[in-house]
């Protein structure tokens, strides 16, 4: 489970044995959210939230959107074409 980004006490990871569509997991202490990276022209979106605050989710969406190209590149490196 490579950590791709870190911000404000949260880690953004991509599980190597995960499934499509492309998404990341945002992990904090005893909490996690799954965020879809979205297709071309789409913004990342929350899929599942297990304990992150609204503020943490909002921050995660901004950071993931800002780093979407890097995250898609890493997804492809781990899983092949998206």
List each model region and its residues.
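Short, charged/polar N-terminal "headpieces" of proteins
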Residues: 1-22
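Intrinsically disordered, low-complexity sequence elements enriched in Ser/Thr/Gly/Pro
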Residues: 4, 32, 41, 66, ...
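Intrinsically disordered, low-complexity segments enriched in polar/charged small residues
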Residues: 11, 28-30, 73, 79
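A short, structured beta-strand/loop element
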Residues: 15-52
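C-terminal structural segments of small proteins and small subunits
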Residues: 52-82
